[in-house]
Structures are given as C-alpha cells and as structure tokens.
Amino acid sequence: CIRDRFENFFSSTDAALSEKGHMFIELLFNDFIRFIGSDYTPLSVEEVTEASIACCVKQEIHGDYAINTYISMDLDTAIAFATRYVHEQFHSYDEYVQASLEDFLNLQNGLFIVNVSNTSNTELTLGAPEHITVSPIQFSGRTLHIPVLYTFGTIDFYMERVSIKE
C-alpha cells in the first residue's frame, strides 16, 4: 500500500512536513508508480543546502504553499526514465528526453495544485519548467532531498521551501 510505504519513508527522519507536504510526497510516489513503474525503493530523506546535478529540471509553485521542485538524475538514468515515461525507446540525451523530465515534473505539480484547490480551496500556480545546468545548485530555503532508487538508476527529487502559509 502506498500509504504504508509513505509513512515508513518519513518515520526515520526529522523531515517534518505540513499537510500539503504530505499530500505532495504521497502524490509523487503514486505518480512514480503510475508513470514510471513500481520497481523503486525510496531511500533516506535528508535536508540539504546544495546538490550536484547532471540532468535537472526545476519548477516553481507559487501561492500560499510556495516551493521550488527539482527532479535530477544522471544521463543514463534520464534516458531510461524518459523511455519508461513516454513508452518510446531513447538512446541518447536529447531535447525529447529533457522534455519528458519537464513534462513529468509539470504533470506532478499540476496534479498537486488541483488536489490542493479541491481539498482546501487554496489556489496555487505553476511557473514554467526550467532546465538547470549550473552545478551544484545552492538552495536558499529549507530543502528536502528525496532520493528514489529504480532498477535503472537513482532519481533525486528536491523540495525547496520558499513560503508556506498553513
């Protein structure tokens, strides 16, 4: 059950999350299962101030729950991720692979803001996905690193707090 997996994921960390934070992470795990596959293992969550990246996409969520979200992975993992996501074979990192990462993050965040609107009448908006090339990334707000190990590689997901009013 995704709820059990989710609860176990955070039980051994000091990474306390708000109600919307829990909603976001639970949706993220569900989206990984739905769009990429269930053959993953969540690794330990940690707070970080910076991250080394290779293939990285960022998207901002604006409003009363303002966060920056990042999905990052190495080149080979990005190619395998895109192959699973769009059900089409890729052999090199190109604009289609990058667009797949952007689309997954945009889909995840779009579903999240709809869920927030439906459950709490809070309107959030999304910025456009951005390809990040400067490494390491320096985070200015409290940032959780959520690594997820798939059979084809590790996906690093980051949630950077900007402004949360709850």
Description of each model-found segment:
Residues 3-166:
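N-terminal auxiliary interaction/assembly segments of multi-subunit proteins
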